[in-house]
């Protein structure tokens, strides 16, 4: 049977095309420059008007899902791997169809409203519903249920501390939190500090045929007795909604779709107010970048409390793709991918770095014929990719992809993937190009923030450069503003440099109940200050070069961007899994605290020390970290990396401390999105940092033996 392409997908394909010869990807609009500010830039195909939606009939996240559910009711929608208590393992994927999800979300949404009426916490207009769970089908069913009734979700990271959870629930005045089993006891414990909370809805069953008083429900209700807290399961609420006969209460484009709390690297989380219009504009651009269609499969494992993952799932829904959720253990993600065989993959540089290290270890670093063949293939494909004629440049090879790259991608479960997308942090150019040629896949880098619904720039598939995050999405415009204190100017040559400002249909409304932060972040003429320092090349590609907020000043007056240095170290030294570069204003050089990846560090330490250290022997790995031979070997590697990347003398790291996982969410040094919290890190490791400086000074002043 012949199926015509839906209007929105046809429009996406049209907007995906390359610009005419001689036209940049992002174009400066004539006459828009101001003193200290660059011209306004827009996508080449959005110069007259910014994109709002690919389909005028679709203006909300509710519409995105509903339109696909009506068009493709029998298609697979959400999948999961059930836990098998007999085998103590996870079974193959099971799937809910779009029709089933549509019915469940309608019933659940109606039931949530009924509960708010029942417990006297219903409010006129919009109100929020808390969502605290790891990725799973019910997470998405809850979010879809909320938008079906013009409610909005307030997502809470699954690994968030109790203090941060308490802050978010109180700040957003939640009466109801939908959560998974592990968090119910925490909510009951926090209830005395949560005056607005009245309803907990469990995504997991609470009754399993136990004798009276012995079920999970009985235990939780006993704990909650006298606290004014009612506990339900999702099944109960769906039944309540079904019985109510309550229909949809669909939202409008200007309504709130979610309040997404930022990770809070320097203070309490900020509630980013995002609208349905923001969601549709960003999703439209997502479909332009990566294309989705019936039969496609998406893997869900990045935290759905992060807007990057939310955008990925909106895009899958509008493309009628199916979404398979990982079984909960990120260390076993590849097992899920091998079953899912996703047609695309969205991730972050940290995971791509691990992929790159694993691929190198299994191919180009192998001895003998296998290693030689792999190096030849990588060299040949790299030459093809860098062909000076753009029309002939390609990451694909008819023979080598079939006999070699297919095995590489199959080992990761990505043999069907047409694309890989990297976001949330810069992707090292060397790693970027290696992944392209090793997998024969379009590897695209993008840039976005919570405030931009994760969408701002993205590399088009026809551009094979690295070291940039692509051109503007057609829903947003940008400009740069000079930063004299950091010596960045929009008049710099050959390209303007300055802080990146964004404005457009995807941009957030405000910070919830925080006028001061909103006024600080948004200019009077509507531009959002990203805090990222950027340059724009001749093709209209955006390159992040610095971060305004995370700049150190050393004793000699030199400014340092530690995040840039950390990114280079992480990309160059595969055995380093975490990096913190520190500069003291009273010192003239840098020191660092690095977390190692035991599986990759053990062979390295074995070689340095001349004895075998098993990757599984964590005690032996930790012992090696304290060996001065190992420290000095790592310092030599850091010096080599510094020379390769032409670091200035004051940018070179003069001393290090090596640890296994020094920064975690649990010790409050990482945000739930695994971003380093710099001020708390300094506080926790103040004594160690002082010792590193003392040791480095002693070693520098010690007399050197003459040869």
From Swiss-Prot:
Q: What is this protein called?
A: Acyl-CoA ligase 891, peroxisomal
Entry keyword annotation includes Transferase: no
Reactions that this protein is recorded to catalyse:
(4E,8E)-10-(4-hydroxy-6-methoxy-7-methyl-3-oxo-1,3-dihydro-2-benzofuran-5-yl)-4,8-dimethyldeca-4,8-dienoate + ATP + CoA = (4E,8E)-10-(4-hydroxy-6-methoxy-7-methyl-3-oxo-1,3-dihydro-2-benzofuran-5-yl)-4,8-dimethyldeca-4,8-dienoyl-CoA + AMP + diphosphate
Looking at the record's lineage, which domain of life comes first?
Answer: Eukaryota
Signal peptide limits? none
Location of the protein in the cell? Peroxisome matrix
- What InterPro entries does the database record attribute to this sequence? AMP-binding_CS (IPR020845), AMP-dep_synth/lig_dom (IPR000873), ANL_N_sf (IPR042099)
Instruction: Map out region (Fatty acid-binding) in residue numbers.
Output: 525-549
Write out the entry's keywords from A to Z: ATP-binding, Ligase, Nucleotide-binding, Peroxisome
Its source organism is Penicillium roqueforti (strain FM164)
